[in-house]
């Protein structure tokens, strides 16, 4: 089998490093390029271990090596992808900047493995337009969307996305508001980055995933359900018209959906999972415990509101992790920011989306400043 070429965007992050783990175990893909933001030490280690000859640096750090092609600056990812035109691009860049990375990956790759949420949440219309133009393969990497991708059929009654409920799922509602960062970062199932772990506790992460599912699978909002599933074994399910339910069950290991996206339609051997005596539970999310998640109905049909929602969450989570606001303040920042964007016209271009994002960042920062100066 001919070796395919791969670029990993965000190679030093959680999904990036787990993608590298897969490459160590399974042959058939050659890593030809990476991007990273600021983890210089790990980037050098990856370059040396995988003999990478192309690097895009998006942060303000100096990467110097005369034997390597290095691109720097805000357009470094686009420039590297245009030069390399890889068979596969793993988009593991986190945050809003992932939207440009995804669009460029779709332009210059044959397959895009998507592990960035914001690109579909904020710019789903742009991603789908580019997909139609280029006919690139888009394979989801999120465990929930990977599961649905594997079992979806032309006609479904419901699609079910599972959620852990986050680190505070068993806390009394009266105490959640004052949870500390160290409490929130103790995720019961997954080992992830800080922002996504906080987003799991607020279930903002699951709100993003509902919006992603709407875009990826062309589903109406009403056909998507979210259930809290404590065991972390069922990643997604589809309810079929004849009463059958198809679900994907596997250990909570991101290397499984990563390998599926990289090697699809071939399944590669990782560690086998054998069924044992297990209990599976499914619960509805509590609106009092997860108020930010239930803003979904308000934002689902507006890319402007979706973009503002994401930007406000980004600001609020950072403020919480730095101790500037309480955990309960995250929802307040999002809600107050969204009020400023009610009736905002739908974006039509990437520039429109970026303008809304930066406007929302500024508004969310003002709300955060106000909250941090009060005892609310």
Swiss-Prot record:
1-deoxy-D-xylulose 5-phosphate binds at residues 117, 143-144, 164, 187, 200, 205-206, 209. Its EC number is 1.1.1.267. Mn(2+) binds at residues 142, 144, 209. Signal peptide: none annotated. The keyword NADP applies. GO terms for molecular function: 1-deoxy-D-xylulose-5-phosphate reductoisomerase activity; manganese ion binding; NADPH binding. It holds the Pfam family DXP_redisom_C. One of its GO terms (biological process) is isopentenyl diphosphate biosynthetic process, methylerythritol 4-phosphate pathway involved in terpenoid biosynthetic process. It catalyses: 2-C-methyl-D-erythritol 4-phosphate + NADP(+) = 1-deoxy-D-xylulose 5-phosphate + NADPH + H(+). Catalyzes the NADPH-dependent rearrangement and reduction of 1-deoxy-D-xylulose-5-phosphate (DXP) to 2-C-methyl-D-erythritol 4-phosphate (MEP). Belongs to the DXR family. This is 1-deoxy-D-xylulose 5-phosphate reductoisomerase. It comes from Thermotoga petrophila (strain ATCC BAA-488 / DSM 13995 / JCM 10881 / RKU-1).
